[in-house]
From Swiss-Prot:
ATP binds at residues 245-249, 264-273. Its EC number is 4.2.1.93. It is an enzyme of class 4 (lyase). The modification Phosphotyrosine is found at Y85. Keywords: ATP-binding, Lyase, Mitochondrion, NAD, NADP, Nucleotide-binding, Phosphoprotein. GO terms for biological process: metabolite repair; nicotinamide nucleotide metabolic process. This is ATP-dependent (S)-NAD(P)H-hydrate dehydratase. It comes from Macaca mulatta. Signal peptide: none annotated.
Length: 389
């Protein structure tokens, strides 16, 4: 598993690059103006230097205000968690909070609830997935949620059987959904569940993508045409956004293909995809919340909904040169649960390096710890990141 320091750095990178990708998806007129020379329909684009599009990113970060109420900047639900698997829903839910959501709910099996709750008192944990009334228990919370992240594990048999009902209820309320892990397995079994629902974002890794592709298109993935394969899968599912994670993340909404090749961490370990899906949940809400006024009059194109973002799977941790202990447990000595009063964070260090596209150096632990502060408390200037970044 990733270290706590690595997890904090990964969330920092995820937040910046994923916000940029979300802005690209939703606002076609500004995007065409900014990247007119590079972008055309049905063409693959590799994005490395997107300095001109960073204003789109800044525009969708909601500014803090004393007039707002709790929950207005994001109430995210994560569905998943059983006795054997408590880490994935925790990482997804806590990532949503670290990116800037106000409230994060976890709907899990009863055996997982005490463990997940013990990880963080900030999470609102509902032990309902193994209840005969699981769908009803989750559905009554849907009017209060802005997005749902599905992390169902096949080990949660009763809850997994109710997953379809929860998804259908979410679609009926037009709630954006992010589907990862075994949620993708269920989609492969029943593609009609998300067919044509363009507020769905699928985040498969290589193996999950191959399974989905074979189930939907009845054939193997063309290894020589990965870009076309992602495009075809998205089209076959009715222009659902597909994010194939890998060395280069390939993103498609069925109309365009975007390849993000910005390098993340070279480590591949458990928990990285969970950071992505949890971050996506709140970013979907932010992008929809921003509205056309944030794009100089550009109309919100719901057919595009959102590009799946490129996740920075983690900037190498300072601990032991990026080879620290493989744990994300809350007791990890590398990143305390609460910032130490003796530590004065360096404002936005790892974010600054990402925005400037400088060579990425391992972030300091204070930088990782201060991510949540800067994403939530440096937004007072009309949603803009601090100029110091």
């Amino acid at each position: 598993m990733v270290t706590r320091a690595g997890a904090g750095a990964a969330v920092a990178a995820t937040a910046v690059v994923a916000l940029l990708s979300a802005a690209l998806a939703l606002y076609r007129p500004p995007l065409d103006a900014v990247l007119e020379r590079a972008f055309s329909l049905r063409k693959v684009h590799s994005i490395k230097d997107m300095e001109n599009t960073l204003q789109l990113v800044r525009n969708i970060i909601p500014p803090l205000s004393s007039t707002k109420h709790k929950g207005q900047d994001g109430r995210i639900g994560v569905v998943g968690g059983c006795q054997e698997y408590t880490g994935a829903p925790y990482f997804a839910a806590i990532s949503a909070l670290k990116v800037g959501a106000d409230l994060s709910h976890v709907f899990c099996a009863s055996a997982a609830a005490p463990v997940i709750k013990a990880y963080s008192p900030e999470l609102i944990v509902h032990p309902v997935l193994d209840s005969p009334s699981a769908v009803d228990e989750v559905e009554k919370w849907l009017p209060r949620l802005h997005a749902l992240v599905f992390h169902c594990e096949r080990g949660t048999q009763p809850g997994f059987l109710f997953w379809q009902g929860i998804l259908e209820a979410s679609k009926a309320r037009d709630i954006p959904v992010v589907i990862d892990a075994d949620g993708l397995w269920l989609v492969a079994q029943q593609p009609a569940l998300i067919q044509g629902y363009q507020k769905a974002v699928l985040t498969p890794n290589h193996m999950e993508f191959s399974r989905l592709y074979d189930a939907v298109l009845r054939g193997p993935v063309d290894s020589d045409d990965r870009h076309g394969s992602v495009l075809r899968l998205s089209q076959a599912l009715g222009n659902v956004t597909v994010v194939q994670k890998g060395e280069r993340d390939i993103l498609s909404n069925g109309q365009q293909v975007l390849v993000c090749s910005q390098e993340g961490s070279s480590r591949r370990c458990g928990g990285q995809g969970d950071l992505l899906s949890g971050s996506l949940g709140v970013l979907v809400h932010w992008a929809l919340l921003a509205g056309p006024e944030k794009t100089n009059g550009g109309m919100l194109d719901l057919k595009l909904t959102i590009w799946g973002p490129k996740i920075e799977t983690g900037i190498k941790t300072r601990a032991q040169g990026g080879c620290g202990p493989r744990t994300t447990a809350p007791t990890s000595p590398h990143l305390p649960l609460s910032p130490s009063p003796q530590v004065q964070p360096s404002p936005g260090g790892c974010i600054r390096r990402l925005l400037s596209h400088q060579a990425v150096q391992p972030p300091s632990l204070p930088e990782a710890r201060s991510l949540h502060h800067h994403l939530r408390h440096d937004r007072r200037g009309g949603g803009r990141l601090p100029q110091a970044l």
